[in-house]
Amino acid sequence: MQLAYFHVAADVPQGAEPDAAVVIDVLRATTTIAWALNNGAEAVETFADLDQLRQSAAQWPESSRLMLGERGGQRIEGFDLGNSPVAVVPEQVAGKRLFMSTTNGTRSLQRVRGVQRLFTLALPNRRAVADHLLMDPPEQLWIVGSGWEGAYSLEDSLAAGALADLLLNAAADEACVVNDELTAALALWQQWKHDPEACLRQASHGQRLIGLGDHDADFRCCAELDRLSVVPVQVKPGVLCAS
């Protein structure tokens, strides 16, 4: 299993495709996706374009859909929810299709949506995703961060290192790191693994969220390691369901 990490969607190689890909947006899209599916959402359908989201959502009955999204860390006007993992509680999302667009995470999902096996990862479902991959190891795995508006993000690299650490320890001689980005992410994980929430708060996007208001509950939720058993898997382009 060859493991590579790409900081943002634009870093993903053109004209190549791995056996599997994992998309990360720790603050907060992939954490919200994991919790929504864990709490009974029928599916999460992701969009980079807001007009396409609204058109697709309009085809569903209002009683069985929710529109989730943020731009610049704040909820999009007219949407039901923003991008907070603590808001997707069972009484809100159970049985519903969630139509979601975020500043960064949905762009990375769109970039690799053609990969045959596509998953999303957050710190709360890290072990679940690792175990799922190890049951049928891909020959080549791309880990794709979301960053912030095309730039590197500390928290996504932390999660990439956290996932790679599990895979490398479990697969022993059958897994290897193939780029420097993942080597750096592994070192970052070793530095912060005993206090991931502190890393999230120190990250520039963490500082951005702090500036927008009280997000303490979000930070705790996003940093909670290996809490969930849900594995979000793409079942058709842009549509994620629980596995």
UniProtKB/Swiss-Prot annotation:
GO terms for molecular function: 2-phosphosulfolactate phosphatase activity; magnesium ion binding; sulfopyruvate decarboxylase activity. InterPro entries: ComB-like, ComB-like_sf. Its EC number is 3.1.3.71. Keywords: Hydrolase, Magnesium. It catalyses: (2R)-O-phospho-3-sulfolactate + H2O = (2R)-3-sulfolactate + phosphate. Its cofactor is Mg(2+). Pfam families: 2-ph_phosp. PANTHER family: 2-PHOSPHOSULFOLACTATE PHOSPHATASE-RELATED. Belongs to the ComB family. This is Probable 2-phosphosulfolactate phosphatase. The lineage of its organism: Bacteria, Bacillati, Cyanobacteriota, Cyanophyceae, Synechococcales.
